[in-house]
Amino acid sequence: MSKPIQMEKGVKYRDADKMALIPVKNMPAEQKEVLRKPAWMKIKLPSDSHRIQEIKSAMRKNNLHSVCEEASCPNLAECFNHGTATFMILGAICTRRCPFCDVAHGRPNAPEAEEPKKLAKTIKDMKLKYVVITSVDRDDLRDGGAQHFADCNREIREQNPNIRIETLVPDFRGRMDVALELMKDNPPDVFNHNLETAPRLYRKARPGANYKWSLDLLRKFKEQHPNIPTKSGVMMGLGETKEEIVQVLKDLREHGVTMLTLGQYLAPSRHHLPVERYVPPSEFDELKEIALELGFTHAACGPFVRSSYHADLQAQGMEIK
C-alpha cells in the first residue's frame, strides 16, 4: 500500500498523483479496452502557429492562465489561431479532483491581487470583443473566489467599455448566497455553470459536487438577473444514456437556462476516466433538435463542442459543431 501524498502549497498534482487522491477509484485505462478514436474525432491543426505563440506569450508575460492549456482542450490550436482564449483566474491549481479534468489539483496559493488589472490590460492589448472568464474551484476561500470574479468583471469593463463578458463559474459549494451577493453589482453578459454529466454519474465524475446544488445556482442567478442569459455544458461518453441527457436538458430548462453546449468527453490521460463511448455526430444533431424543442435559444452540440468553444459565435446564435 502506497503512502498518502502530502500536498505542498502551490504544487500541481496531475494524472496518477491527482487520481490517487480521489476517494472513488476508477479502473485504470490499461485494464480496460481503450476505444479507438473514430474518423470524425480527427483534428486538423493550423499550418501557421504564429498567432498561437502570440497568445501564449501574452499569457506568460502577465502571469495569466488559460483553461485551454491547463485543461488540455483539443480545440486550443483552432481557438488560439483565431485570437480567442478562455482566461482562468484564481491560479491554476484546483481544490477539487474531478477524474475527467486535466486541471491540476493541490493546495493553491492566495489569489493575486493584481490579476484583475493584468487581465483587463491583456484583453485590451489583444483587442478582444468577447471574453470568457473561468476559474478553478477555490474551496479554500470563504467566498469561493466570487469577489475576485466581480473585481475582474469591473476592471475588464473599465479598460474595455465595449466588451462582452461570459463567466464560467464553479459551484461555490457551501457559499452560494454569499457568492451571488458579491457578484450582484458586476454581473457578466452571460452566466455559465456546467452540470457536466447526468446525476447518476456525479459520484464517479464529479466528487464533491451536487447536481441539485448546481441547478439551484443557475436558477438563483437567473432570479437575481432575469435579463442575463444563463448557460450550461454537458459531456457525453462517460456512460450516460440518451434518456438521462434528455432529462438533464429538461432540468436545465426548468431552472431557466436557455444556452447549451453538448460535446464529446475525451480522456486527458490513461489515468483519467476512460471514454465509454464515442457519440456519432448524428446523435448530437438529434439532441440539438430536442434542445431547441425544449426551448433552448442557443444549442451548440457536436463532438468538439466545449463550453467556451467559439463562445462569441454561440452568443450570437450561430451554429457551432
Swiss-Prot record:
Cofactor details (free text): Binds 2 [4Fe-4S] clusters per subunit. One cluster is coordinated with 3 cysteines and an exchangeable S-adenosyl-L-methionine.
Any Pfam family: LIAS_N
Record's keyword terms, sorted: 4Fe-4S, Cytoplasm, Iron, Iron-sulfur, Metal-binding, S-adenosyl-L-methionine, Transferase
Binding site for [4Fe-4S] cluster 2: C94, C98, C101
Cofactor(s) recorded in Swiss-Prot or TrEMBL: [4Fe-4S] cluster
GO molecular function, a single term: 4 iron, 4 sulfur cluster binding
Secretion signal span: none
SMART domains: Elp3
EC numbers on record: 2.8.1.8
Places the protein is found: Cytoplasm
One GO cellular component term: cytoplasm
Residues given in the record as [4Fe-4S] cluster 1 binding sites: C68, C73, C79, S308
Pathway stated in the Swiss-Prot or TrEMBL entry: Protein modification; protein lipoylation via endogenous pathway; protein N(6)-(lipoyl)lysine from octanoyl-[acyl-carrier-protein]: step 2/2
Domain Radical SAM core: 80-297
Top-level class of the enzyme under EC nomenclature: transferase
Disulfide pairings: none
InterPro entries registered for this protein in UniProt: Aldolase_TIM, Elp3/MiaA/NifB-like_rSAM, LIAS_N, Lipoyl_synth, rSAM
Catalyzed reactions per annotation: [[Fe-S] cluster scaffold protein carrying a second [4Fe-4S](2+) cluster] + N(6)-octanoyl-L-lysyl-[protein] + 2 oxidized [2Fe-2S]-[ferredoxin] + 2 S-adenosyl-L-methionine + 4 H(+) = [[Fe-S] cluster scaffold protein] + N(6)-[(R)-dihydrolipoyl]-L-lysyl-[protein] + 4 Fe(3+) + 2 hydrogen sulfide + 2 5'-deoxyadenosine + 2 L-methionine + 2 reduced [2Fe-2S]-[ferredoxin]
Family note: Belongs to the radical SAM superfamily. Lipoyl synthase family.
Name of the protein: Lipoyl synthase
Species whose genome carries this gene: Vibrio atlanticus (strain LGP32)
UniProt lineage: Bacteria, Pseudomonadati, Pseudomonadota, Gammaproteobacteria, Vibrionales
Gene transcribed to yield this protein: lipA
